[in-house]
């Protein structure tokens, strides 16, 4: 099935919305040892993951199309193995992250995520990686970043007993198809489809989820 790439302006606005949502929700976290929907992670670890991912995105952009991520996706194995390798990378990076309060990690995330947003417009059509013979651009990966930020905004919301829905959930569908090509997107209402495809349950306030 052919999927039309999402509109650039919508992706950029959705990206910024996700960063703002994470910052706003993190400001309301009072217990950083609270459990999250992300498996065994507490809120402090989710904040650390956000910092690591935002810093990685800057690295991947700088090194594209020969980044660590591009080399990982160039491997032609099963998607499940790719997912496990990414999970191991997440765990390893979190393990060596310096100890710091949750708000400090969120501030570092915001700085890196903002720098990424400033850089990507001028590199939108540059090749970011190749997966199973298809070239994916910096703009495509910006869509993946949108998905990442809004999913983790939802995680933070559930951690503090709230719900969350992106302002423009519809753009996350093509963003997923072009930014997360190794994972299928289930059918359904756009935001619920994204939640379910990531391993989250829209109906439950807590439970294990993909990262």
Give the location of each predicted region.
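Structured surface interface patches that mediate subunit assembly and partner/cofactor docking
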Residues: 1-14, 18-24, 28-42, 59-80, ...
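Glycine-rich loop at the start of a catalytic domain that most often binds anionic cofactors/ligands
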Residues: 49-50
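A basic- and aromatic-enriched beta-loop-alpha substructure that forms the phosphate/nucleotide-
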Residues: 80-95
């Amino acid at each position: 099935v052919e999927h039309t790439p999402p509109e650039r302006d919508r992706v950029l606005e959705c990206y910024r919305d996700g960063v703002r949502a994470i910052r706003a929700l993190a400001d309301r976290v009072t217990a950083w040892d609270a459990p999250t929907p992300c498996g065994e992670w507490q809120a402090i670890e989710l904040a650390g993951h956000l910092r690591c991912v935002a810093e990685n995105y800057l690295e991947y952009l700088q090194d594209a199309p020969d980044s660590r991520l591009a080399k990982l996706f160039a491997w032609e194995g099963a998607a499940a193995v790719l997912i496990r390798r990414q999970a191991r990378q997440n765990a390893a990076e979190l393990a060596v992250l310096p100890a710091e309060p949750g708000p400090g990690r969120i501030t570092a995330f915001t700085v890196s995520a903002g720098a990424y947003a400033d850089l990507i417009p001028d590199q939108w059509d540059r090749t970011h990686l190749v997966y199973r013979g298809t070239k994916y651009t910096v703009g495509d990966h910006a869509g993946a970043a949108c998905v990442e930020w809004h999913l983790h905004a939802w995680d933070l919301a559930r951690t503090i007993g709230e719900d969350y829905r992106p302002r423009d959930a519809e753009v996350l569908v093509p963003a997923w198809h072009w930014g997360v090509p190794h994972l299928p997107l289930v059918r359904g209402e756009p935001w619920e489809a994204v939640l379910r495809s990531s391993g989250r349950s829209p109906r439950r306030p807590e439970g294990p989820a993909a990262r």
